[in-house]
A protein has these predicted regions:
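Gly/Ser-rich catalytic/binding loops embedded in alpha/beta enzyme cores
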Residues: 1-159, 260
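Flexible, acidic loop-helix segments that line cofactor/substrate-binding pockets
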Residues: 25-28, 227-237, 267-280, 303-316
Length: 426
């Protein structure tokens, strides 16, 4: 018996000790399959002539990714009992080839359609800092597998913030890559014009390595002493209506970056707030196209909050959609123009600290929209972005900083994160 199998067994034991919480984190947890995959990883690592980048790492899988022999349910009763996938999706195949072990299928907001993580079918877990606070969504279960030390990496997806929001709440690193850099093959969609696969991890280097494997790309080394980072700081949109804790954290981050010699420049991104409804229109319309034939069934077996969000598309005309797609194209161009003189931009990942589950259940529409606000601006603009923790002391929930760039400038984001992260932790 090798080290990878031993590690998998120890993690399985941890899951078994969670009691009822495990059912809120995982939609499926097949111990025998995990051990078979661990045995295969052990053999793959032993036979490889070179070191595998994810050798022996346990990777939880959001229940949107196809795995051979398993039904992908999107954490919905609607999809339970449907035929199992006949093969692994491309991302799963890549992480296995890199030496990783898939470690359970994780719960999410139904169909990945919320930023708060509520799920009436599996229950909603609290976050790692507050058992009564929301976990963030939609990659709620995945975030907790990493935050609780069950897995090294969680595979998530991000349509409006579903990697970055739970990462921010649970003190993790969550990366939303450029959409066209990631394969969506075999990943159950919500809105294909916005969906992006992405990793969550407990440290920056692990998140970067996971991204490299998932995308089939390698972050190039930086030669010599790098120049100061040219950083855009939003004058509007991302920094309006912040709660006091978030405002104080962001001001402190900006001071640290300025003191370290980086060049902070105010940029006007107010057009993102002015066009935020485009996200609501297009995601609802694309989700409606996928699920409208099942609306009758979802009236009895679905989450009514999710169904209501999809049914917003019933109010839209073809002209509304044509206009929204055209405006999004304009917004992407405007974002590129606004970012022309900077390397990256920064903002708080979230405008507020995590509310209580009960508060969100009582005021879902407002709080879900608020939690999605900053992250979804960057889906609207088709950007790439990472959320990294802003430490706040032992036992205190950290804040979170988002670092972003225009589509295709992932390496700029990750290089900036490598330089900014130590400043925040120092």
């Amino acid at each position: 018996m090798g080290a990878i199998i031993d590690k998998a067994k120890a993690a399985i034991d941890k899951v078994d000790q969670l009691g009822d919480l495990a059912a809120k984190i995982f939609t499926e947890f097949d111990r025998d399959r995990i051990l078979r995959d661990a045995d295969a990883a052990e053999e793959r690592v032993a036979q490889s002539a070179t070191a595998l980048p994810l050798a022996g790492m346990l990777v939880s899988v959001k229940d949107l990714y196809d795995e051979a022999g398993v039904t992908t349910t999107a954490a919905s009763k609607l999809l339970q009992g449907r035929p199992a996938a006949t093969r692994d999706c491309e991302v799963i195949a890549r992480i296995k080839a890199a030496g990783a072990v898939p470690f359970g299928r994780t719960a999410l907001s139904e169909f990945a359609y919320s930023g708060v993580g509520l799920n009436p079918h599996y229950g909603t877990p609290g976050n790692v800092f507050d058992p009564e606070g929301i976990p963030g969504g939609s990659t709620s279960g995945g975030a907790l597998t990493v935050a609780l030390g069950l897995a090294d990496i969680a595979l998530g997806t991000d349509t409006g913030g579903s990697v970055r929001i739970p990462s921010a709440i649970n003190g993790l690193y969550g990366y939303k890559p450029s959409r066209l850099w990631m394969s969506g093959e075999g990943i159950h969609p919500l809105a294909k014009s916005f969906d992006t696969a992405g990793p969550l991890a407990g440290d920056l280097q692990t998140a970067i390595t996971a991204f490299e494997v998932m995308a089939g790309k390698t972050l190039p080394a930086q030669d010599g002493k790098p120049a100061p980072i040219k950083i855009g700081v939003p004058a509007h949109a991302f920094v309006n209506d912040l709660d006091d804790r978030v405002r104080a954290d962001f001001d402190a981050v900006c001071k640290k970056l300025n003191d370290a010699g980086h060049q902070l420049t105010e940029i006007d991104l107010g057009f993102l707030a002015e066009n935020a409804v485009i996200n609501k229109i297009l995601v609802a319309a694309e989700a409606h196209k996928i699920y409208s034939r099942d609306f009758k069934a979802l009236e009895t077996c679905g989450d009514p909050r999710v169904l209501n969000r999809m049914r917003f598309a019933d109010t839209l005309s073809a002209a509304d959609l044509i206009d929204a797609y055209a405006k999004r194209t304009d917004v992407i161009a405007m974002f590129s123009s606004a970012m022309a003189d900077v390397d990256v931009m920064i903002s708080p990942t979230l405008p507020m600290m995590a509310p209580k589950i009960a508060e969100v259940e009582a005021d879902f529409d407002r709080l879900n929209a608020m939690m999605l606000r900053n992250t979804s601006y960057l889906n609207l603009s088709d950007a790439c972005a990472i959320s990294i923790p802003v430490p706040a002391g032992d036992g205190v929930a950290p804040g979170a900083l988002m670092i972003a760039a225009t589509h295709g400038h992932d390496f700029a984001v990750l290089h900036a994160a490598r330089r900014i992260d130590p400043l925040l932790r120092g």
